[in-house]
């Protein structure tokens, strides 16, 4: 459960991301593909080279979903219900991959927002991404 301080930290950090959300989303995907090559198996039809239009496009989708989640911190299940259905029933993404993308996103944010990425903000973002991952995998059962 996110505390009021966590929610404030998440909103402030995501506010700093601003217009770079799609770019950071794509960078986090690229980082995940490089660091955890098995994640590429879910994207057999993508050009996974750095800077590819498909990775940028999916990065924008990831960023849009996270932006929606930030806007609905008090109702993540409602905000992410369709995305949860998609990943559980159609795409069948192994739940561990959400943790890998979350880690890659944290590294990406830390590299772009070093002065804002305090231990408290890191902890809040980590909790937020864990909550998003939990919601996205909730319909697997």
Swiss-Prot record:
Superkingdom in the source lineage: Eukaryota
Record keywords, A-Z: Heme, Iron, Metal-binding, Oxygen transport, Transport
Pfam families, sorted: Globin
Matches recorded under SUPFAM superfamilies: Globin-like (SSF46458)
Gene3D superfamilies: Globins (1.10.490.10)
Binding site for heme b: 87
CDD domains noted in UniProt: Hb-alpha-like
GO cellular component, one term: hemoglobin complex
MF annotations from Gene Ontology: haptoglobin binding; heme binding; iron ion binding; organic acid binding; oxygen binding; oxygen carrier activity; peroxidase activity
Expression (tissue specificity): Red blood cells.
Binding sites annotated in the UniProt record for O2: 58
A single BP term in Gene Ontology: hydrogen peroxide catabolic process
Family: Belongs to the globin family.
Described purpose of this protein according to its UniProt entry: Involved in oxygen transport from the lung to the various peripheral tissues.
Subunit architecture: Heterotetramer of two alpha chains and two beta chains.
Name of the protein: Hemoglobin subunit alpha-1
Species lineage: Eukaryota, Metazoa, Chordata, Craniata, Vertebrata
């Amino acid at each position: 459960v996110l505390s009021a301080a966590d929610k404030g930290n998440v909103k402030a950090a995501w506010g700093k991301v601003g217009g770079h959300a799609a770019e950071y989303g794509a960078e986090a995907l690229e980082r995940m593909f490089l660091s955890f090559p098995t994640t590429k198996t879910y994207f057999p039809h993508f050009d996974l080279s750095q800077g590819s239009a498909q990775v940028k496009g999916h990065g924008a989708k990831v960023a849009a979903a996270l932006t929606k989640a930030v806007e609905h911190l008090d109702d993540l299940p409602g905000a992410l219900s369709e995305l949860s259905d998609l990943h559980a029933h159609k795409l069948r993404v192994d739940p561990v991959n959400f943790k890998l993308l979350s880690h890659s996103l944290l590294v990406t944010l830390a590299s772009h927002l070093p002065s804002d990425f305090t231990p408290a903000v890191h902890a809040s973002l980590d909790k937020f991404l864990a909550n998003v991952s939990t919601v996205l995998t909730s319909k697997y059962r």
